[in-house]
């Protein structure tokens, strides 16, 4: 377990500040997560539902009077009398909160849309469901308020028809009209606690919390007593922590560090429990909090603190006079007590798991939270808490040095230097010494004595010198474990058996919990509000013609006013919301957001706490620097200022001349030496000539002088003592300079290099750093280092590439690679190694061009193309221009499924047929699908196609693979599926995981018919005038060339999937630019290009069908930064955050659209006869064809024109007659 502990704590103890800051940042994020969960939970929500009941009104004698629902129902159920019933429904439109305060909303358009275009669920229009205010009229009673912040649409309905129409409206959910998006039911509602401001939220939360706790007054007094006892024990635990920390010499910081570690563990535990679906109730957490504190306890962090304080080198130097690094002190303390701490954690978590499996309500959740909290507390103890202890050790050392420096200055004592220049260690390096100066004990006043008697003497457990006395193991941990086990046992028995008459079930039955819903009435719609009263008055005016006498009784009106429906209006274009926003308002909004963030009650406290800790810690560190580690450092501070030196420079000898003896003898005084965290490695280097032995009385490398030093002189001597290394040449390396290069760089013999390699510092990469490249090449050439293991041995990607390049070059016949123009520098080889390529010697750059942009499904996309073919990007751009003029390209995804087709052998065709039938059956397919999809959360099996060839069964799995191209994913899933199939057919033999039934990287009719990867169909309409002006041809000519070339010509050639002009050209260029597998252009380029006239022959209708585009945006070449940057340009890099597979599908749509642009441009060029001229102008190599060529047969008279090519093999291959020669054409 020590290895595990060191793995967790090594980084934290040597980088404590970074660890603490990182953990506090994560804790802040966890706090925001918890805060969001609390604000949007139902705990603080109102205990009654926010629904509002409808109101009922009766118009009699020109006045509206509230009536009951029974009266309105009677008028509805018994029509034909003097009463007429109807329903009113108001639709309130609200603007987005981010719009300007002065913005208004015109609801006339959306109101007309709702009335005219939204039918009821039954299919009836609103006009047939509405209420007519008079008998002869045909218009409905509808009212719309004028433009404003919240306009209101009022609709009238016949009785019983409002719900039919309202259900249809709510089914719409969203309506987009005139650039505005309307969300039905998402408008203004009762403000929830999640929407409140910080101050209002705190007040509301406190009031809701008080009300919730007030509801607990009906709880049993025994339960309240148990909770009260728990809180008392929790505060006793806090007091024990404070007293134990004070006994270890810390009044505040140790206990604060332990408490902060536990608090952060609790903050991390709550989101973790939420993700694990452990129910968390604030009331239950409040009741369980004291028991959680007692369960976690602080005995384990205190045990680790005692082990640190008991370390012999916490304040005492080592034998070489240097202080052991604080991180090493913490790690050695962990080695001593870490296993016991882990044992206690494991036992407590194991006991809590018994409670988790007890199936007792309440106890199960408490034990689950407590176990998770203990696990997180264990992690924080070995990470955050160890970093805090490291800082405490450093601060304690600095404080001790400062106190001793003050004592020396009071006694006017200085540091003594012995005859050989070694400073005498003081009281910190001795347990007891007669020469040590004993500080006089100060007389404590009454207040100090009272404090010591009440809370204990500070540092009472520490020896003289500040080190903890050895103590036996505290039995408190075992006692706590026993109490937890007893608590769980009694709780389970008290719940499951009737030991007494006052069990938990009996108390619950005698005191049932009453909710607020039983006493709080549900509110009604208020008909006296101005919005409703105004509508009712308008209805009364419109209804006056109906108040005629029929017989002798006037017709009266009863109205049901339902709760309003809110519709949220959100402008789609950001410019609409921010059209009036100037720079000053933007800055004001930013400052307001920042003020609200900083004004958060917890964030502001974190900032203040961190600032206070930073100021206090910086004060200690600056005082420690000022105090120094000895009198010489203190004098240097006074005279020359503070200078920081690394350990590597401190070992350089300052002078070869002996220093004069000090004039005065000095008393011994303590001196503390601080060492860096990692020791410097001194590698053996060859010396050009032996040097004479130095004198015996030579001072050691590190000497503390009794007189002030001139820092400028010391710096000059240090620079002179450093070895001088010549910089590498900046001019290009030529073959001549390469030949003399070994004489310029001294190369050690093979024996010396092998000695450094085998006996040098470990790991081996450190030893190889002391060898130059030529010496490493020598080791590789002699077989000591394998070329494929250079990266592992050197631990340097760039150097490994450089060395491998030299090895391959010198072993080749031409020996030109080492100094060739193949680039090597400024490349991130870390992403390549182990993922994309092996035996890397550089990289091959390709020109990257951008065609377009092209409008695809309403959005503009640039088309990245990596190619070395001239006119390709320009031609594709011309096609994009023509397609954009016609409105762009529309694409559809018809299928998405990567395939893998293994070959399986059976002993007979009968068993092979049975296996085929099993796979194609419902039960067999379900079994294989379950096994297949268990290997990845992205692998979703679409279908299985089987085929028999003798005794061999071929199974073609088609799978959705998310945003990855999916070959690795589906191969792993296929292996799992075949393993499950072998349980049903043990005699089967898997011949090959890929039996070429996929078919991968090979042309095949099955891929053309069934599809593989993404199947895309694209369509576009190009106007005839664009065909003439941009493409310089006609619609009739294009259709004729396409039919004769792409369809008839390909059919004559017997092509499979090759019914196109040059789809592979564009597809491969995009593949190379976006990091796809270029080998898969074989099947991905399967394409059928169709053209036909439309709109009476005036325009051109063009379609592209590509059934097997195999692309991905995750893995493979997409991990390389250049290719990833191109995917960023398209907005499809990585996995889609919400819809897996959407990024890869979008990339396939872009590729198909780009192919359409390239096809359109090339066929137009063929139809117009521009192809040859374009290639002669843009894609013809002038160096290789200096003159226009024409048919010519060389004869005997042409021998004089024979020239020899300057090939590297010309000097080696004698008598070559055909190779290396060319005949000029005349």
Curated annotation (Swiss-Prot):
**Which Pfam families does the entry link to?**
HMG-CoA_red, Sterol-sensing
Q: What are the record keywords, sorted?
A: Endoplasmic reticulum, Lipid biosynthesis, Lipid metabolism, Membrane, NADP, Oxidoreductase, Steroid biosynthesis, Steroid metabolism, Sterol biosynthesis, Sterol metabolism, Transmembrane, Transmembrane helix
Active site residues according to the UniProt entry: 869, 1001, 1077, 1175
Extent of Polar residues compositional bias: 434-445, 1201-1210
Q: What is its EC number?
A: 1.1.1.34
Q: Where is it mainly found?
A: endoplasmic reticulum
GO BP terms: namely: coenzyme A metabolic process; ergosterol biosynthetic process; isoprenoid biosynthetic process
What GO molecular-function term can you cite, just one? Answer: hydroxymethylglutaryl-CoA reductase (NADPH) activity
One cellular-component annotation, GO: endoplasmic reticulum membrane
Positions of transmembrane segments: 17-37, 224-244, 252-272, 337-357, 373-393, 481-501, 1150-1170
Q: Where does NADP(+) bind?
A: 936-938, 963-971, 1179-1180
The record's subcellular locations are: Endoplasmic reticulum membrane
Q: Which residues form the SSD domain?
A: 223-391
The residue ranges flagged as biased composition, category Pro residues, are: 685-702
**Entry keyword annotation includes Nuclease:** no
Catalysed reaction per UniProt?
(R)-mevalonate + 2 NADP(+) + CoA = (3S)-3-hydroxy-3-methylglutaryl-CoA + 2 NADPH + 2 H(+)
Task: Locate the region Disordered.
Answer: 428-449, 683-702, 722-742, 1182-1226
Relate the induction remark in this record.
Answer: Expression is induced in ganoderic acid (GA) producing conditions.
According to its UniProt entry, the function of this protein is described as:
HMG-CoA reductase; part of the first module of ergosterol biosynthesis pathway that includes the early steps of the pathway, conserved across all eukaryotes, and which results in the formation of mevalonate from acetyl-coenzyme A (acetyl-CoA). This module also plays a key role in the biosynthesis of triterpenes such as ganoderic acids (GA), a group of highly oxygenated lanostane-type triterpenoids which are well recognized as a main group of unique bioactive compounds in the medicinal mushroom Ganoderma lucidum.
Q: What family classification does the UniProt entry report for this protein?
A: Belongs to the HMG-CoA reductase family.
Q: What is this protein called?
A: 3-hydroxy-3-methylglutaryl-coenzyme A reductase
Q: What species was this sequence derived from? A: Ganoderma lucidum
């Amino acid at each position: 377990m020590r290895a595990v502990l060191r793995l967790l704590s090594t980084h934290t103890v040597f980088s404590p500040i970074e660890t603490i800051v990182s953990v506090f940042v994560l804790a802040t994020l966890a706090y925001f997560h918890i805060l969001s969960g609390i604000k949007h939970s139902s705990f603080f929500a109102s205990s009654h539902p926010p629904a509002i009941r409808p109101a009922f009104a009766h118009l009699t004698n020109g006045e509206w009077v509230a009536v009951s629902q029974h009266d309105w129902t009677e008028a509805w159920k018994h029509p034909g009398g003097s009463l007429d019933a109807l329903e009113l429904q108001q639709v309130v439109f609200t603007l987005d909160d981010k719009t300007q305060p002065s913005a208004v909303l015109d609801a006339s358009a959306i109101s007309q849309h709702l009335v005219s275009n939204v039918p009821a669920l039954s299919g009836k229009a609103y006009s047939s469901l509405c209420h007519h205010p008079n008998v002869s009229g045909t218009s409905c009673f509808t009212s719309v308020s004028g433009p404003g912040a919240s306009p209101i649409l009022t609709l009238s309905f016949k009785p019983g028809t409002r719900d039919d129409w309202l259900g249809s409206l709510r089914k719409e959910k969203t309506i987009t009209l005139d650039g505005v998006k309307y969300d039905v039911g998402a408008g203004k509602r009762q403000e929830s606690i999640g929407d409140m401001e910080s101050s209002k939220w705190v007040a509301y939360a406190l009031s809701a919390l008080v009300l919730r706790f007030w509801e607990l007054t009906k709880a049993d007094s025994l339960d309240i007593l148990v909770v009260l006892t728990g809180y008392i024990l929790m505060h006793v635990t806090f007091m024990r922590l404070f007293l134990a920390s004070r006994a270890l010499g810390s009044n505040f910081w140790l206990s604060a560090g332990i408490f902060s570690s536990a608090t952060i563990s609790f903050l991390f535990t709550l989101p973790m429990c939420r993700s694990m679906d452990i129910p968390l109730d604030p009331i239950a957490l409040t009741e369980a909090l004291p028991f959680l504190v007692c369960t976690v306890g602080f005995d384990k962090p205190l045990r680790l603190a005692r082990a640190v304080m008991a370390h012999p080198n916490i304040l005492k130097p080592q034998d070489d006079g240097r202080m052991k690094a604080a991180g090493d002190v913490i790690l050695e303390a962990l080695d001593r007590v870490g296993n016991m701490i882990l044992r206690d954690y494991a036992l407590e978590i194991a006991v809590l798991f018994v409670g988790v499996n007890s199936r007792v309500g309440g106890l199960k959740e408490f034990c689950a939270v407590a176990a998770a909290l203990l696990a997180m507390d264990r992690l924080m103890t070995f990470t955050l808490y160890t970093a805090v202890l490291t800082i405490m050790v450093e601060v304690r050392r600095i404080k001790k040095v400062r106190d001793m420096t003050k004592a020396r200055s009071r006694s006017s004592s200085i540091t003594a230097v012995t005859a050989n220049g070694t400073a005498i260690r003081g009281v910190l390096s001795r347990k007891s010494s007669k020469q040590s100066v004993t500080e006089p004990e100060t007389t404590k006043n009454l207040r100090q004595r009272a404090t010591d008697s009440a809370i204990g003497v500070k540092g009472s457990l520490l020896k003289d010198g500040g080190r903890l006395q050895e103590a036996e193991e505290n039995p408190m941990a075992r006692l706590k474990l026993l109490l937890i086990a007893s608590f769980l046992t009694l709780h389970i028995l008290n719940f499951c058996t009737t030991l007494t008459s006052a069990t938990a079930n009996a108390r619950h039955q005698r005191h049932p919990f009453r909710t607020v819903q039983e006493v709080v009435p549900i509110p009604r719609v208020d008909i006296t509000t101005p919005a409703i009263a105004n509508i009712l008055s308008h209805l009364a005016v419109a209804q006056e013609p109906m108040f005629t006498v029929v017989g002798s009784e006037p017709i009266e009106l009863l109205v049901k006013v339902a709760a309003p429906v809110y519709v949220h209006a959100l402008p789609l274009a950001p410019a609409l919301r921010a059209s009036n926003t100037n720079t000053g308002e933007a800055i004001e909004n930013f400052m307001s957001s920042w003020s609200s963030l900083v004004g958060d009650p917890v964030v502001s406290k974190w900032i203040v706490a961190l600032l206070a800790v930073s100021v206090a810690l910086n004060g200690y560190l600056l005082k420690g620097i000022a105090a120094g580690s000895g009198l010489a450092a203190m004098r240097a501070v006074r005279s020359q200022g503070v200078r920081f030196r690394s350990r590597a420079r401190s070992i350089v000898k300052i002078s070869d001349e002996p220093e004069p003896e000090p004039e005065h003898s000095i008393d011994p005084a303590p001196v503390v030496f601080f060492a860096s965290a990692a020791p410097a490695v001194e590698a053996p280097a060859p010396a050009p000539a032996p040097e004479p032995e130095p004198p015996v009385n030579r001072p050691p490398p590190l000497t503390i002088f009794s007189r002030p030093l001139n820092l400028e002189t010391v710096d000059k001597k240090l620079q002179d003592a450093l070895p001088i290394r010549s910089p590498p040449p900046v001019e290009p390396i030529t073959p001549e300079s390469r030949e003399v290069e070994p004489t310029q760089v001294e190369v050690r013999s093979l024996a010396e290099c092998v000695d450094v390699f085998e006996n040098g510092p470990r790991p081996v990469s450190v030893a190889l750093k002391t060898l130059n490249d030529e010496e490493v090449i020598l080791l590789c050439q002699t077989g000591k280092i394998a070329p494929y293991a250079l990266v592992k041995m050197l631990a340097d990607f760039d150097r490994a590439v450089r060395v491998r390049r030299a090895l391959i070059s010198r072993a080749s016949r031409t020996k030109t690679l080492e100094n060739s123009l193949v680039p090597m520098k400024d490349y991130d080889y870390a992403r390549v190694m182990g993922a994309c390529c092996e035996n890397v010697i550089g990289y091959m750059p390709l020109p990257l061009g951008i065609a377009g942009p092209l409008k695809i499904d309403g959005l503009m996309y640039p088309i990245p193309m990596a190619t070395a073919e001239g006119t390709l990007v320009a031609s594709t751009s011309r096609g994009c221009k023509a397609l954009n003029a016609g409105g762009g390209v529309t694409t559809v995804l018809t299928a998405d499924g990567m395939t893998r087709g293994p070959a399986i052998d059976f002993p007979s065709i009968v068993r092979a047929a049975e296996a085929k039938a099993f796979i194609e059956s419902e039960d067999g397919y379900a079994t294989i699908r379950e096994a297949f999809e268990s290997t990845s959360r992205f692998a979703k099996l679409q279908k299985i196609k089987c085929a028999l060839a003798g005794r061999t069964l071929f199974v073609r799995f088609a799978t959705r693979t998310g945003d990855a191209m999916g070959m690795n994913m589906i191969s792993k899933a296929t292996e799992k599926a075949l393993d499950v199939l072998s349980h049903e057919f043990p005699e089967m033999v898997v011949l090959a995981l890929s039996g070429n039934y996929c078919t991968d990287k090979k042309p095949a009719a099955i891929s053309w018919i069934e599809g593989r990867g993404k199947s895309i169909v694209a369509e576009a309409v190009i106007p005839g005038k664009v065909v003439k002006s941009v493409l310089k041809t006609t619609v009739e000519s294009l259709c004729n060339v396409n039919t004769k070339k792409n369809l008839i010509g390909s059919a004559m050639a017997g092509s499979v999937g090759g019914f196109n002009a040059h789809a592979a050209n564009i597809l491969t260029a995009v593949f190379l630019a976006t990091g796809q597998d270029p080998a898969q252009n074989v099947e991905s380029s399967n394409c059928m290009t169709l053209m036909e006239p439309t709109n009476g022959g005036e325009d051109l209708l063009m379609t592209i069908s590509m059934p097997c585009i195999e692309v991905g945006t995750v893995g493979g070449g997409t991990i390389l930064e250049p290719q990833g940057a191109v995917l960023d340009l398209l907005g499809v890099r990585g996995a889609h955050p919400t819809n897996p597979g959407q990024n890869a599908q979008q990339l396939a749509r872009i590729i198909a659209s780009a192919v359409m642009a390239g096809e359109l441009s090339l066929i137009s060029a063929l139809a117009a006869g521009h192809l040859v001229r374009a290639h002669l102008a843009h894609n013809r190599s002038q160096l290789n064809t200096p003159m226009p060529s024409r048919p010519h047969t060389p004869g005997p008279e042409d021998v004089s024109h024979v020239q020899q090519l300057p090939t590297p093999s010309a000097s080696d291959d004698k008598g070559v007659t055909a190779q290396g020669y060319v005949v000029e054409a005349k």
